Amino acid sequence: MTTPVNEVPEPSYPAAERRRRSDSDSSPTVDGNAYVHDESQPHDGAYAGAQYGSHLQVDTTFQDFDKTSRSPSAAREQAMRLEDDLAVLEAERVASRSTHGTEKDARSGDVHSLTRSRSRRAEDVDEFDEATNPLHEKAAVYNPPENPSTGVSKFIKRVHESSFIVRYFTYIVPLVLILLIPLLVGALAYPDASVGGVELLWFSVWLEIVWLTLWAGRIVAKLLPTPVNIFASIFTNNSKKWRDVAKQLELPVTLFLWWLGVEISFLPTMKNHHVDGNSRTRDWENTLNKIIISVFVWTILNLIEKFLLQLIAMSFHRRTYSDRIEINKFQIGSLTKLYAFSRNKIAETDEAFEEKQDKSGSGAKTPLRYAGKARGLALGALNKVGDVAGAVAADFTGRKANSSSHPSQVVIALLRTTAGCQTLARRLYRTFVREGFDTVFPGDLKEAFDDNEEAEAAFSMFDKDMNGDISMEELEAVCVEIGRERKAITASLKDLDSVVSRLGNVFEFFVAVIAIIVFLTLISTSAAGVLTSAGSSILALSWLFSATAQEFLQSVVFVFVKHPFDVGDRVTIYGNSGEAGLGDDYYVKQISLLYTEFKKMQGHIVQAPNSYLNTLFVLNQRRSGALAEAVPVVIKYGTTLEQMDALRQRLLEFVRSERREFQTNILTELRAVTENFSVTLNVVFFYKSNWQNEGLRLQRRNKFICMLMVALQEIGIEGPRMNLQGASVDIPYHIAGFPPPYQARDGPPVNDDGGQHPPHTPSSGDDQHHQPGHSPSYRRPSILRKGMVAANARARGVSISSRKHVDFSLGMRDVASNDIMGDVFEARSPAADSAVRQVIAERRIQEEEAERQSVESSRQRNSGSRTNLTVPTSTNEARHSIDSQGASSLSSISRNRFFRHRSHSHSTRQEDLMEQGRSSEQGSSSAAAIRPISPSYHPDEKKL
């Protein structure tokens, strides 16, 4: 290493006279670790060095002023970079594992494999996509066991998971063959045999009709969505909705068509094939026909009830959640594009670093490096093959498949937790913030989107305060809000589906009652009198059911008609709730048909009946816009209007400097004058958001209240008790008939006439209470700014936030984005149970893979005696081997991203020690042995 010709001299620190630092207003302030230069003082000459020698004097001739200091946001992002990258890699691993698991099942030809079914669902369906379906989906009637133990159960499970053609053929043929036995007996062996006066042959034919009509109706109902879609496309723009309705009504339509066919075929088949040739209807035929009619009426009412239930679910979904779902999907799509751009950009940086490191390699490392590259290429090729196979399987199943490296899977995985949302936000901030700036501007996002309009829409999504830039804290808050909104929509729609299910159960009960009444009316003529007497008895007991019926109707109206809140909303319930009985604030945790669960700010869970909530006023914070708050300040009587105006101007200056938090407007209102003793002044300030996020509200309110306190202290506005006797700081007692004390001054008293004239003594009537402009109390220096430094900073346009000594949010700035109090979703999902199930599932998969590999290895050893070539027996084994071999290369790339400066810092430290002459010969030799010798290095060029 050569020493440069022109060395930069070390900074010189001239000796200064030590003196105590003055607390006067002329001394500059220190904000954090930054020295605020006072431009009001001289800076050059010996006099300056002698007079102001208490300040550190540094020669800044060779200082690089273009390099800006790191902002707190950038410093926090740099400190969290390692954890963020590890979290992103974990999310990518989870997304890739779930995707490749589905693809492996698709490539093996068995989507519902037994191995996968034991661990998790065959398809990892996103809860958000599953919940945002506007229809009310009925659960499957039969769910096969996950681990069938007998051969019959395994056969039934395979049949149930096969195609509908195989299933229908398997279900239809056995019973058809059984019913064919009496048909053949009546046709061939006993032609004169009869059942109830009907020929055995035709009675068996009718039984075949009953069985085959069921499956014919099933097939017609399954094919019904296609013509419904075509017909609806002629009259509406949303034909998919009606097609999905037809899919959900498949079972009710099947039952309706089945019993329609049974009713149509029963009497003609029976009456026209009597043994005696008489076509008169028999008694049992009339009775059975009435039963069939009753069941047919039930199927009609059931079809109408299911159709109305779907209409209720769709209309409620469209009216309440459609806009929120569309906005959240756009937000997640924008985050996906931003993350994809970020990943590509960081990958390019890593590849450039890897290429730079490759230049120094030689010898035996070169083949290993190329082998690692080959493994990486093979791994990428297999990933592409898996993606193609997944796309083919998706084409057959009609589902949309994403590749294993699709950014949307990673973004969704990160949005599931608050920490993941913050990690994603810091990752995006790291990518898009420009060097030397603390915020992201609209032009920084244009590279990640296709057009400027989409980029502007995405920027407005993050720029909640509409000030033209995005800070890292704001980005974190928006990402947490997007993830929280996604979980809120999912939870709300799940609760809605549960409510619709319970409402459907109630409707089914009424349908069954109506069907029973119809059956009793048809089966007997005397049933009318029985029903009349039963109705009278029910009316006599109406007092017993009236309260329940009223509560049910009020709950239905509250949930489906009014619906004042959703899951996750912060609401204020007015009424007899709360500790004081005047109402309280809650977060909605769960909505049911008859009750709603709330979470208090303290964490308590409260349950309230919907019938009671139906009669109360409900304030919804999430549905509210930007809010204002009035802070009452009680000041002493006699405070001048100039002081009040100065207070308003000082607060206006504050809110204009904090545009990210507040609107630039302050209102003042004199509410009351109390007995010429005190004045109540209302100070109204405006937030830029609502109070849904309690942490953010506390942060902003603390900032404003602290600033209000400081402004009152600086201006000299005092409380009403300063008008009381003995309230002065200088003379804390009252003497009757003695003149009031002189006003305290910041500087020494000045007497221009040499002390010949005594100071002015006010008359007896000129009391301090009549001089509101003066304050007898001692004004302490502000914690915010001091004297000329504030004036100079204000003249330069420096924001107030840059001159703070303390955190005005009182610690709420760091927890505002978490919104711990408003998180009602962690308790809904049993995290411990899901984690245990996931670990058990992974353990099963590992055990099965190990067992399969042991079987394959033993098979290879047995075949090794016949051949010397060992070929992997399956694609999965080859894939597993390449995965295990490529893990080291992937981990090295990740390790290079985290620890790329370690060796460089070590060599730099050795070089610094050598230049300072503090390194020993051994250290120098070791450092020289470690550092590579550049081609341009010559020992003779070193200058001592």
Curated annotation (Swiss-Prot):
Residues 94-110 have a biased composition (Basic and acidic residues). GO terms for cellular component: endoplasmic reticulum membrane; perinuclear endoplasmic reticulum. It catalyses: Ca(2+)(in) = Ca(2+)(out). GO terms for molecular function: calcium channel activity; calcium ion binding; stretch-activated, monoatomic cation-selective, calcium channel activity. Ca(2+) binds at residues 463, 465, 467, 469, 474. PROSITE patterns: EF_HAND_1, EF_HAND_2. The keyword Hydrolase does not apply. This is Mechanosensitive ion channel protein A. It comes from Emericella nidulans (strain FGSC A4 / ATCC 38163 / CBS 112.46 / NRRL 194 / M139) (Aspergillus nidulans).
